[in-house]
Amino acid sequence: MNIKPGDRWCWFFDRQHDRLMLDLANGMVFRSRFPSKMLTPDAFDASSFCVDDAASYYHFAERCQASGLDTAQCAELVLNALVAQRFLKPIMPKSWYFTPQPGRYVPEMGELVGVQLLDTPDWGRLLVIAPGASASLCLLAQPSLALAGKRLMLGEAIKVMHDRLLPLSTHPETLSDDTTLACAG
């Protein structure tokens, strides 16, 4: 699924599906993973796909290439990243799922980061959407991740304190889905 942003793309809210949608103007419509209760008021008004959206799309798409996801999964992750960046309400950190890490690390927007699950040797891979002063909004950048009785799916949002994140470039580990993180180091 190779898609490229176009000037005819349009955001709209679909009440029947309770999801923000992106009309890709070629007969395809993307349905985001976020329900109305997670969206800002702007999400309920139709709006054009703007230049900033396109710039973020290319930034996230470039970074997603190192994720190990297939083309369709990358497209889904990138489009959900745009929704989260532009329309998601603030969420509280849920860092208690992850092991604290040594050092002071502050990720960049679009960076792939790793988190180690608390009390297990399993690791997860996240895409940073909006880095903050002490925590970052991230999306799950792997097919799924089991978190203490709950399962996160590809593209789901979670906010994580920076002291739980590690750059993938310095910490290769095995993910819970038996996929090895592609890292240098």
From Swiss-Prot:
It is found in: Cytoplasm. Belongs to the ZapC family. Pfam families: ZapC_C, ZapC_N. The lineage of its organism: Bacteria, Pseudomonadati, Pseudomonadota, Gammaproteobacteria, Enterobacterales. Contributes to the efficiency of the cell division process by stabilizing the polymeric form of the cell division protein FtsZ. Acts by promoting interactions between FtsZ protofilaments and suppressing the GTPase activity of FtsZ. Keywords: Cell cycle, Cell division, Cytoplasm, Septation. The keyword Cell cycle applies. InterPro entries: ZapC, ZapC_C, ZapC_N. It comes from Edwardsiella ictaluri (strain 93-146). Interacts directly with FtsZ. One of its GO terms (cellular component) is cytoplasm. GO terms for biological process: division septum assembly; FtsZ-dependent cytokinesis. This is Cell division protein ZapC.
